[in-house]
Amino acid sequence: MNWHDLNRLHVVSNLKKILGKWFSLDCIFLDEKGRVKTNFLEENHTLYSDFFKNQVSSLSGREHFNSDLESVYNLLINTEGGIQIYPSSFESINFVCCNLVYENKIMGSVVGYPFVFNNKSESLEKLINDLMSEWKIDLVQIQKTITSLKVSDNNLEYLKDLISLVSQEVITFHEEINEREERIKDLSSELGSRFRFHTMIGKSANMKKIYRLLEKVSSSEA
């Protein structure tokens, strides 16, 4: 899987943007071994979730996230397919995931985070306040995070459809790359068999001169 090109794919970037604006979550890719293949810590990488942005800005927050992600991966590799929802270590905050399956083989996963089911509960606000204080986030950012999670749409079916669309685009991209590589390989093989030295035909005077020299060399014992 060409993760570098995949992360820059126009249609995937647009779907990530829609997921970010509608659901205030970020979309992350894992490879078949559960390693993160989205460079969300890079300075120029756009994060749509204020919660996630604040979480990964803190060492303890990143440790929490990596631990949760490992648990999610271990659950994902044992599922047959479809959209899966797994809880994080924080109450009400979840992962929405889908395996990337190509020719019956898991090539990686798409992970949406964070998704909140009960975003109107008072306990959520307390949770965010406690976590952000632990991560040393200022009060303005805390309030912004609470607001972003509270306005997040709870329409799970739309979210599932979008995550599924991301996975389909990833597999389509992978298929096209594989087909292109196979065509190049076949073409190289065909050209190799058709244009050997003895079948090469050159009509220019210089090419004919080279052929005559090559024939002399090829027939000599040296």
Regions found by a protein language model. Give the residues of each.
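AAA+ ATPase active-site-proximal loops
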Residues: 191-222
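Structured interaction and signal-relay segments at domain junctions
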Residues: 3-8, 12-92
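A short beta-strand signature within small-molecule sensing/ligand-binding domains used
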Residues: 83-84, 89-100, 106-117, 125-127
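Residue-level signal for well-ordered, solvent-exposed loop/turn and beta-edge residues enriched
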Residues: 35, 104-105
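Juxtadomain coupling helices with adjacent low-complexity linkers
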Residues: 1-23, 79, 108-185
